[in-house]
């Protein structure tokens, strides 16, 4: 049920007789001859609603009560269906392991983490569908991606083969300059006895180097092993210069809808802006832009 903008304070608009008895002029009060009635002598109907203005906090109030993130990173996760992409994200964001498999079309998760010097980093994690029928919709997720995680399951050699045949060509086509890391999921399967059916770590490592991935990490969402390492590696690769650089005072332009930017970072020809720290400038240049 939608919240009403106006709250009812008194009166009864559902009972017509009640309204008439309280506010309608009786026959004894009517003038005996037709004429113009004096407005100030007319009785008034009771007001059934009284307006109540909602309290909307100003930007300055929100800034005082909630610290705005210093950085915003968008990470897009791709790979074959059922390799464990959703479990990876839920395990990282919520700390739980989902037991039921529900195919994902598109799903977004947002979480804030704290950097080594107290910086607030907002992560926007985009889960995508690996099924072929969604191949035309999937590129919509790549816009403004800062990191691409191409995933495979250690229990499926086919999913690793598709990394080379399908996923790297696709993300390289749409995001040629965006950093890509290779992530192996379900590493807890190595505890089983049928190791011959599993992906050999050395094969995945050599593939990552050959394809130009900046990192290759295997993890287990069920056991929560190496989950944090996956995302910390992505963050440090992008923001290592920014997170550990000393903060220098700068003259900033206040904008309530965007992160503060320095005047020297505004391109007069295009109006584009970038934050003043060198690491984030590099991040903007490598951001995926879908034309």
Swiss-Prot record:
Propeptide residue intervals: 289-291
Classification via SUPFAM superfamilies? P-loop containing nucleoside triphosphate hydrolases (SSF52540)
Question: What domain of life does the UniProt record list for this protein's source?
Answer: Eukaryota
Positions carrying Cysteine methyl ester are 288
Main location as per UniProt:
membrane
Task: Give the EC number(s) under which this enzyme is classified.
Answer: 3.6.5.2
GO molecular function term, any single one = GTPase activity
Give the similarity note: Belongs to the small GTPase superfamily. Rho family.
Name of this protein: GTP-binding protein RHO4
Which species is the source of this protein? Saccharomyces cerevisiae (strain ATCC 204508 / S288c) (Baker's yeast)
Q: Which gene encodes it?
A: RHO4
């Amino acid at each position: 049920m939608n919240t009403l903008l106006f709250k009812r304070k008194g009166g009864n608009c559902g009972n017509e007789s009640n309204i008439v008895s309280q506010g309608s002029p009786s026959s004894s009060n009517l003038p005996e001859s037709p004429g113009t009635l004096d407005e100030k002598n007319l009785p008034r109907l009771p007001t059934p609603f009284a307006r109540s203005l909602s309290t909307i906090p100003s930007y300055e109030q929100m800034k005082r009560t909630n610290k705005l993130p210093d950085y915003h990173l968008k990470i897009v996760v791709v790979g074959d269906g059922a390799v464990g992409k959703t479990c990876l994200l839920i395990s990282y964001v919520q700390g739980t392991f989902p037991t039921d498999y529900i195919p994902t079309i598109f799903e977004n998760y947002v979480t804030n983490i704290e950097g080594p010097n107290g910086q607030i980093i907002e992560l926007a994690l985009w889960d995508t569908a690996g099924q072929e029928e969604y191949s035309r919709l999937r590129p919509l997720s790549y816009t403004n991606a800062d990191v691409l995680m191409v995933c495979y399951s250690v229990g499926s050699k086919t999913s690793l083969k598709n990394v080379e045949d399908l996923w790297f060509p696709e993300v390289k086509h749409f995001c040629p300059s965006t950093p890509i890391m290779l992530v192996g999921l379900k590493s807890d399967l190595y505890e089983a006895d049928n190791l011959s059916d599993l992906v050999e770590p050395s094969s995945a490592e050599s593939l990552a180097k050959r394809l130009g991935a900046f990192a290759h990490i295997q993890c287990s969402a069920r056991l929560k092993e190496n989950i944090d390492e996956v995302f910390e590696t992505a963050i440090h690769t992008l923001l290592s210069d920014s997170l550990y650089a000393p903060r220098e005072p700068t003259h900033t332009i206040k904008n309530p809808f965007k992160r503060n930017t320095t005047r020297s970072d505004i391109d007069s020809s295009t109006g584009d802006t970038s934050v003043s720290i060198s690491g984030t400038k590099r991040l903007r240049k490598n951001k995926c832009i879908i034309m």
